[in-house]
């Protein structure tokens, strides 16, 4: 008995499993980045001035909401996580459905848009993290990470997860585009075969 190759949802079962696995990992990476950054907060009491020998202390809090780039980072990672979760659910529950060109095209476009979105958010957050770590002597912005080390470490962890999400979303986009190309070749050969018959 010869084994038949099962074609599922615009590609082979191998590409279906690969895409599902990549989406699951991209979902976990972007969700982890969003959660770590959204819970990133550190409060410290610091000496802000000295009058004579009397130190004046203030309690300062570093949190992600203070920086618009970090807020964008959290929102973008949540949006990409939601997109991946939705695509995972659709991929699992509509496995038997035949994907036509428009549906595959819209999925590929959404994947590319989400890869761009998470990349932009991660790069904006890296820019602000660099300012927090090293400051800017020309603008007279002091560094923050020497005082809020835990805050900066958590932010670095979120950035690592986000860049893993960027790489995974680029791979998801590549697989989505290849499935679209395979489907269009399959449709064109089917149309040619029917036209000849």
Curated annotation (Swiss-Prot):
Signal peptide per UniProt: none
Record's keyword terms, sorted: Acetylation, Cell membrane, Membrane, Transmembrane, Transmembrane helix
Protein name, UniProt field: CASP-like protein 1B2
TM regions (residue ranges): 18-38, 70-90, 107-127, 157-177
Cytoplasmic-side segments: 2-17, 91-106, 178-197
Highest taxon, organism lineage: Eukaryota
Cysteine disulfide links: none
Coiled coil: none
UniProt keyword annotation of Oxidoreductase present: no
Modified residues (N-acetylalanine): 2
Subunit-level organization: Homodimer and heterodimers.
PANTHER family: CASP-LIKE PROTEIN 1U1
Primary residence: membrane
Membrane topology field: Multi-pass membrane protein
Compartment annotation: Cell membrane
Family: Belongs to the Casparian strip membrane proteins (CASP) family.
Gene Ontology CC: plasma membrane
Extracellular side: 39-69, 128-156
